[in-house]
Amino acid sequence: MLYYFYSIFHINIFQYITVRAGIAFFFAFFLTLYLMPKFIRWAMKKSSYQPIYSLAPEHHKKKANTPTMGGVVFIFSALLASLLTVKIHNPYVLGGFLTILGFLAIGVIDDYGKITKRSNQSGLSAKQKFFLQILVAFVVSLFLYEYAHLNSNLYVPFYKYPLLDMKIFGILFWTLVIVATSNAVNLTDGLDGLATVPSIMALTTLAIITYITGNAVLSHYLLLPKIIGVGEVSIIAAAFAGSLIGFLWYNCHPAEVFMGDSGSLTLGAFIGYMAIISKSEVLLILIGFVFVMEALSVIIQVGSFKLRKKRVFLMAPIHHHFEQKNWNESKIIVRFWIIALISNLIALITLKIR
């Protein structure tokens, strides 16, 4: 909307992505700070509490009366801030909104089932959730290929030329990226603030890359692919970063509210979407290294138990492994934040080395 003020009234400052991203960031931050306490009070009245997994470490039982679905609040704040600041007609913006709303719907349905039936196993079944994730991700990927005409080249760090053109198979690859990232962030969201800060870092890194990719001068200088119009999505990322910092105020240890699947599934999907449109699918391994660690620990644990009847970790995802080793929860969280910070800095450094 602010961009159209520039078009109508010729207020030049609103044509700049960086200015609108800054406005979106602070608007979403303050709106989340304002709305979250109201949501927490409402959720407690409605007994919208987070069901605790029966096999979770013993000290998690004290989290049983913590409200969940806080993701709905910070996503609403981010979406409203985005609607006020982006070019709505931009195809990459539309694809981002489609991703956010689709995965938000899946998360809300799942969270609502868990809350109403007071069980962590009573939301969507794993098969139902996976099917819906694939469906939404496929529609988004098809939209990018057919409507946004996003090129299907695959790029890798340290190499300035595309490794290969996936052509129509890019749709399947992009679907995999979105679904995998969505589930990886969801697995990470097991301790207070554990998924929140790495998500802020990943969104910030991807906002920078997306802005560069959409800028003809900067993309040429850094030898990155030039994708006209994609920089507009960095405003949505800035809005999410702002709303997440506002959410962290209440989600830091000891958490007053959890984001729920409505938050984690949506965040992960949007992070995956940003990696796709900025041609950073492979670099996403570094950008979301904490998420990769968490997801791999589950894959290794399940695979090892099925093949060898032995567990590699005391418990998976890996943050629970460290809990079982009697690490303090705050220490685990901060150390994972440090890992996320270092991996994102390395990811940014790779942009210059080509």
Curated annotation (Swiss-Prot):
User: Does Cell membrane appear among the keywords?
Assistant: yes
Q: Which Pfam families match?
A: Glycos_transf_4, MraY_sig1
Record GO biological process: cell division; cell wall organization; peptidoglycan biosynthetic process; regulation of cell shape
The Gene Ontology CC terms held by the record are: plasma membrane
The pathway this protein participates in, as annotated, is:
Cell wall biogenesis; peptidoglycan biosynthesis
The UniProt entry, under InterPro entries, shows: Glycosyl_transferase_4, PNAcMuramoyl-5peptid_Trfase, PNAcMuramoyl-5peptid_Trfase_CS
**Where located?**
Cell inner membrane
This one is known as Phospho-N-acetylmuramoyl-pentapeptide-transferase
Membrane topology of this protein: Multi-pass membrane protein
PANTHER family per UniProt: PHOSPHO-N-ACETYLMURAMOYL-PENTAPEPTIDE-TRANSFERASE (PTHR22926), PHOSPHO-N-ACETYLMURAMOYL-PENTAPEPTIDE-TRANSFERASE HOMOLOG (PTHR22926:SF5)
Instruction: Report TM segments.
Output: 16-36, 66-86, 88-108, 130-150, 168-188, 193-213, 227-247, 257-277, 282-302, 331-351
Its Enzyme Commission number(s) read 2.7.8.13
The organism's taxonomic lineage, starting at the top: Bacteria, Pseudomonadati, Campylobacterota, Epsilonproteobacteria, Nautiliales
List the catalysed reactions: UDP-N-acetyl-alpha-D-muramoyl-L-alanyl-gamma-D-glutamyl-meso-2,6-diaminopimeloyl-D-alanyl-D-alanine + di-trans,octa-cis-undecaprenyl phosphate = di-trans,octa-cis-undecaprenyl diphospho-N-acetyl-alpha-D-muramoyl-L-alanyl-D-glutamyl-meso-2,6-diaminopimeloyl-D-alanyl-D-alanine + UMP
The GO molecular function terms of this record are:
metal ion binding; phospho-N-acetylmuramoyl-pentapeptide-transferase activity; UDP-N-acetylmuramoyl-L-alanyl-D-glutamyl-meso-2,6-diaminopimelyl-D-alanyl-D-alanine:undecaprenyl-phosphate transferase activity
Organism's domain of life? Bacteria
Keywords, comma-separated and alphabetical:
Cell cycle, Cell division, Cell inner membrane, Cell membrane, Cell shape, Cell wall biogenesis/degradation, Magnesium, Membrane, Metal-binding, Peptidoglycan synthesis, Transferase, Transmembrane, Transmembrane helix
UniProt function note: Catalyzes the initial step of the lipid cycle reactions in the biosynthesis of the cell wall peptidoglycan: transfers peptidoglycan precursor phospho-MurNAc-pentapeptide from UDP-MurNAc-pentapeptide onto the lipid carrier undecaprenyl phosphate, yielding undecaprenyl-pyrophosphoryl-MurNAc-pentapeptide, known as lipid I.
The answer on whether this UniProt entry bears the keyword Cell cycle reads yes
CDD domains, per database record: GT_MraY
Cofactor(s) needed = Mg(2+)
Q: Which NCBIfam families does the entry mention?
A: mraY
